[in-house]
Amino acid sequence: MIYVVATTKVKPEGRAAFIDGAKTCIGETHKEKGCISYELHASVNDPDIFVFVERWETREDLTAHGRAPHLKAWRELSAPLKASPTEIEIISGGEVQKL
């Protein structure tokens, strides 16, 4: 099993658009092969910080997700809404890889 934790800080004025766009991406991602879970969480300390927590059956499933058209659309929509780059960690077999 592969876990992904992706943390993003958004611009305050972009928060609503970020959440709306994320809902679309999440819905499409749940249909993907190998997606066990794909959730968005908001920080309780900072309303502009969001964390995606993902679980995938295999690394190949995660790789396919990275090429999905809806993820490409999400990246394009969310890029101008971010206050800083997304921090991504992939966890597998007890190892953590930071991208």
Regions found by a protein language model. Give the residues of each.
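Short amphipathic alpha-helical segments
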Residues: 14-37, 70-74
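Generic alpha-helical hydrophobic packing signal
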Residues: 3-9, 15, 19, 23, ...
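Glycine-rich beta-strand-turn "strand-cap" elements at beta-sheet edges
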Residues: 40-48, 74-99
